[in-house]
């Protein structure tokens, strides 16, 4: 599994909005300038995230974006999942999209399931607020 540019930019956008929304709605123009990301690309990402109910959008003068809930209620995993879709490290774990004929006898399947669980648990345990506050824990590999 590789996090795409879209996923990385989505997380950066959400962090930026969380950091700056105390002064009101945050424009994508401002996010684009601060983050060095194309405004057009951010518009596509913001649309997906808004449709998922994670952002509130207001058009017009003094419009922009704001988190729909407190930053503490968004996990990094939930944000990435909106734009990335499946976070499975291998195709055979994307059940809805792919059925491997060897799934029932595959000796390596438990390895991939374990890796997926580590990734999911780690990213689910980090909130947007944690990222904003710089409280990103190292992975607990025990």
Where are each of the predicted segments found?
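Short amphipathic alpha-helical interface segments
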Residues: 10-22
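Key DNA-contact positions within bacterial/archaeal DNA-binding proteins
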Residues: 40
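Basic amphipathic alpha-helical segments that dock to polyanions
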Residues: 45-50
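Beta-hairpin "wing" of winged helix-turn-helix
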Residues: 54-62, 66-67
């Amino acid at each position: 599994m590789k996090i795409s540019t879209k996923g990385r930019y989505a997380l950066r956008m959400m962090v930026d909005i969380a950091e700056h929304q105390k002064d009101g709605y945050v424009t994508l123009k401002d996010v684009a300038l601060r983050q060095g990301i194309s405004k057009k690309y951010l518009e596509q990402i913001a649309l997906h995230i808004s449709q998922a109910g994670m952002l509130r959008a207001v058009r017009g003068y003094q419009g922009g974006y704001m988190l729909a809930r407190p930053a503490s209620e968004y996990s990094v995993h939930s944000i990435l999942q909106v734009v990335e879709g499946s976070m499975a490290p291998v195709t055979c774990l994307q059940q809805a999209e792919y059925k491997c004929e060897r799934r029932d006898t595959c000796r390596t399947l438990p390895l991939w399931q374990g890796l997926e669980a580590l990734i999911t648990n780690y990213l689910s345990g980090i909130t947007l607020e944690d990222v904003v506050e710089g409280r990103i824990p190292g992975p607990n590999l025990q």
